[in-house]
Amino acid sequence: MDLRVIENLETELAIEIEGEDHTFMNVLKGALLELDGVTAATYDVNPEQSGGQTEPIVTIKTDGSIDPLDALEQGASRVRDKTDAFEEAFEAAA
């Protein structure tokens, strides 16, 4: 997975995440929206409306109480924690 910063402002961050699709992006967006200080988290994977863009771009907006890069790091940690919890539950059920 390669990341490319599109825009990095004080309260807004846009990053292209190469090789991912709706499955991962929805989970990441949900984790970001659970964070205090994140006012919006969206992603775009629409090549028709984006001039041929095929890799997803996640956009994070904050209220200024959290840096958008820190929010991305915390959101990714939440995804990892949820994945680990699911794996443990799955193994226990098998």
From Swiss-Prot:
Keyword Cell inner membrane attached: no
Record field: catalytic activity: RNA(n) + a ribonucleoside 5'-triphosphate = RNA(n+1) + diphosphate
Cited PROSITE patterns: RNA_POL_L_13KD
UniProt keyword list: Cytoplasm, DNA-directed RNA polymerase, Nucleotidyltransferase, Transcription, Transferase
GO MF annotations, alphabetized: DNA binding; DNA-directed RNA polymerase activity; protein dimerization activity
Chief location: cytoplasm
Enzyme class of the recorded protein, top EC level: transferase
Keyword Membrane: no
Protein role: DNA-dependent RNA polymerase (RNAP) catalyzes the transcription of DNA into RNA using the four ribonucleoside triphosphates as substrates.
Complex formation: Part of the RNA polymerase complex.
Family: Belongs to the archaeal Rpo11/eukaryotic RPB11/RPC19 RNA polymerase subunit family.
Name under which the protein is recorded: DNA-directed RNA polymerase subunit Rpo11
Provenance organism: Natronomonas pharaonis (strain ATCC 35678 / DSM 2160 / CIP 103997 / JCM 8858 / NBRC 14720 / NCIMB 2260 / Gabara)
Classification of source organism: Archaea, Methanobacteriati, Methanobacteriota, Stenosarchaea group, Halobacteria
Gene: rpo11
